[in-house]
């Protein structure tokens, strides 16, 4: 998406690597929710000197971070994609609490590899950890609680995007976030179909890219 927005609008885009991500699972085990917010703030500070306005665009947990951090940092607008309001069913709170006493990781259990993806070629190029660190799930729960408290404080324009075919973070999560944005100056929601959770890489990605482009362009002109 960053490459698309740069090509279409000439925007400077930064893909923030959150603490514990894209390295090794044991690095994720050591990460806390405050490390993730610090990663966002670091990225914001890198862009601040090079941009007139900054937008947050976040996928999944990145969407929750975008909502929360928009109340702490000066941004022009936010785009959330497949953002959770509650913990995915794969990580019920009781399971996290119980297993945390004697396990470090939980296996990924939702079907065979590629389940939920519509573009199988895109899935082949998708890289993720093979295990779910239990501590990270507990930290995500804390982050979501913080996001809930922050929703009424979000005042910037927000575009919420979710796939109706997302079986990991169910579509009703977007509705609950939308309802919670009681003070956003502009809020829009978009449902797409024919994609799973990672809509920025799955079959509906072009529609998602164009929606984000049009939203940012519109807000920039106001």
Annotate each predicted stretch with a short phrase.
Residues 1, 156, 170-179:
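Short alpha-helix in the alpha/beta-hydrolase fold that links the catalytic acid
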Residues 6-25:
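Conserved alpha/beta-hydrolase
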Residues 79-90:
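Active-site nucleophile loop of the alpha/beta-hydrolase fold
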Residues 154, 160-162, 166:
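Short beta-strand/loop motif that positions the catalytic acidic residue
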Residues 24-50, 55:
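Catalytic nucleophile-loop/oxyanion-hole region of alpha/beta-hydrolase
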Residues 12-15, 175, 179-198:
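Catalytic histidine neighborhood in serine/cysteine hydrolases
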Residues 188, 193-222:
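Catalytic active-site module of serine/aspartate enzymes centered on a nucleophile-bearing elbow/loop
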Residues 58-62, 66:
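Gly/Ala-rich beta-loop-alpha elbow adjacent to hydrolase catalytic centers
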């Amino acid at each position: 998406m960053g490459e698309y927005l740069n090509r279409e609008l000439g925007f400077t885009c930064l893909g923030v690597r959150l603490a514990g991500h894209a390295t090794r699972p044991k690095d994720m085990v050591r990460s806390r929710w405050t490390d993730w917010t610090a990663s966002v703030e670091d990225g914001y500070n890198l862009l601040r000197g090079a941009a007139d306005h900054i937008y947050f665009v976040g996928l999944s947990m990145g969407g929750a971070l975008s909502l929360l951090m928009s109340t702490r940092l000066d941004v022009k607008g936010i785009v959330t994609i497949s953002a959770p309001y509650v913990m995915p069913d794969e990580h019920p709170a009781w399971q996290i609490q119980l297993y945390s006493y004697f396990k470090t990781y939980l296996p990924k259990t939702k079907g065979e590899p590629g389940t939920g993806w519509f573009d199988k070629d895109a899935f082949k190029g998708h890289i993720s950890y093979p295990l779910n660190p239990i501590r990270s799930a507990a930290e995500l729960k804390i982050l979501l609680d913080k996001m809930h408290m922050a929703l009424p404080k979000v005042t910037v324009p927000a575009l919420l995007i979710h796939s109706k075919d997302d079986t990991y973070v169910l579509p009703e999560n977007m509705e609950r976030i939308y309802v919670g944005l009681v003070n956003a100056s502009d809020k829009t929601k978009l449902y797409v179909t024919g994609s799973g959770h990672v809509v920025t890489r799955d079959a509906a990605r072009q529609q998602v890219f164009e929606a984000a482009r049009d939203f940012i362009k519109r807000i920039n002109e106001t």
